Amino acid sequence: MKKKNIYNWTMLLAMALLMMAAGTACDQNKNNKQASEPTVEQTEMTEVDMEALAKVMPKYSSASGFSEGLAAVCDKETELYGFIDKKGNEVIPCQYYYISTDFNEGIAVVYKSSEEWSLIDKKGQEIASFDNQFRPGFNDGFHDGMMAILNFDDDKEGYIDKTGNVVIPAELDMKMCNGPISTNFSDGLRRWYDYSSQKSIFIDKTGKKIFECEGEAEDFSEGLAAVRKCFTLDNDDFECRIGFVDKTGSEVIPFTFTHAGHFVDGLCWAETENTCGFINREGKFELTGDYKTLVLDEGIECGNYPLCPTFSEGLAWVCNKDGKFGYIDKTGKVVIPFRYESHYDEDSELFVTIPCYDFHGGLARICDKATEKYGFIDREGNEVFPCQFESAEDMSEGLAIVERDGQYGFIDAKGNCTFDMSK
């Protein structure tokens, strides 16, 4: 999928790879909010002024979606970054070299230059500043009060707290394949994979090891984590299966699945050789159909990425055996017909693009196979916005950032847009 956003990930990855060369799968925490920070509900109810946004957006060359009431923007003239609110006010001036993450838990990560980055609060006040001794992790900032930091000289990562103090030294091996380099704490635990022992290790926020298990684990969700184990067969070949462990590392769902996602509202996408659908916490299939797992062709040597659906706002997209996508509800009823198609490589049996996405704020993104442009549908499958945007993100706090003809703007669930839709 071709997608642009405000963050200069290409630049960041390039610097990462250069530094490394020089040196060598398929929750928001509400308890760590500072008392002065608005709740998620208060932030989402912030009044939006679409007319004001329409007036200011032409001055920016790119923008992100809103997070905690603010959106990152890049000034066309200076090519520097700052933040606007939902009324179009530039509350944090465009003065940064670039922005690494949106606001999360009241903090954003910004670069003052290519050699110096900082944590700032929502008033633009600097909390802590860092040089290139280590870099911010490739994730979306703070979770559970912690954020990953990367040391490319030693290929290690650690964690800082919201004051900028190093809580866990950068001594954990960075995970380079089959997932992001750095992961967030989830359910109070963080995972990392030891390639030498082929075991997954879970640590708490002090860096203490809680347990380890054989195989490559995913993050915990609703108290369970998927783990992928590979077994040697009689012919010296091997096969891999996925099961689930609890927070003690005990197996609670047997290793019988070829693909599996993570639990949301007590359901998890899973697939065996004969069955595909959603399982419950006992590992039993509750919703099944003539489905298959979406496996994306990532074009990387270390493998391809299975994208497992989850329920969001009561609906989940699924792919049928014919390669068409639609949406089902939690009874298994098809609510939006199987009419969305993806580019599919028959030789590799891999999908190249994603035609539809989860629902957020009452709308879901869709992507037209022919034009590779994005639009939005409502929960009945009606097109609120036809596929006309070169890039688009999910609805967030009542708005979604979209790109049309090289210009960024916002849309809402009522069909309003900061663009002149008559052109």
Region annotations inferred by a language model:
Residues 2-12:
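Bacterial N-terminal signal peptides that target proteins for export
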Residues 21-25:
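C-terminal motif of bacterial Sec signal peptides marking the signal peptidase cleavage site
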Residues 15-19:
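Hydrophobic core
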Residues 37, 41-423:
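Residue-level detector of conserved, function-critical positions
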Residues 1-3, 26-49:
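Intrinsically disordered, low-complexity repeat and linker tracts
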